[in-house]
Amino acid sequence: MVIYSVPARLVHAYPGRIAVRVDAADEAVARLSEADLGRVASVQIRSPTAGRELRRWGRGVPVDLVMAQPSVDYPSLYEYAELGRDHPLRVSMPTEPGFLRAVRLAVSLNIAVKLEVGQPGPAEIEEMARVVDLYLHQTTTSQPIEYFHSVLMALVHGGAPTTLWVIQEEDPALHRHVDAAA
């Protein structure tokens, strides 16, 4: 089934499963009705502002916090940690210098991580190696760190072949990104 990733203002233009992109948590609360929540695959918050508005809203709806500058924005994870009680919670971040600190904090707060990997330089490769080590050897890690989790699961279980496009939710056969102009 295809999931359309749409800005909150276009929710009603797309029937079926949707991933809703908002700039702040309060926008999701204001724009999505209870009826809409049944088709929402996730809410992606693109600003590291406090998410208190989501605590009593849409219980069970997955929340993906996009952290554009993980080396700077990582303290905002403390504000979101309590949401994990009512929502599956994940933080998505680019692999830029300093992202390891954000990954460590997310893991300690029991928040899943999705790494958005571009063409890494030597510093990013070193940090990625440290993240893999953290994921494999820190016994308190209980949430997945993607893309490592899915790649390792595919290797261990030898199931159906997969691609990084599928793992990173960028396969156009499964995920379609709709820009603000629709």
Each PLM stretch: what is its role?
Residues 2-181:
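Radical SAM enzyme [4Fe-4S]-AdoMet core and its adjacent flexible, acidic
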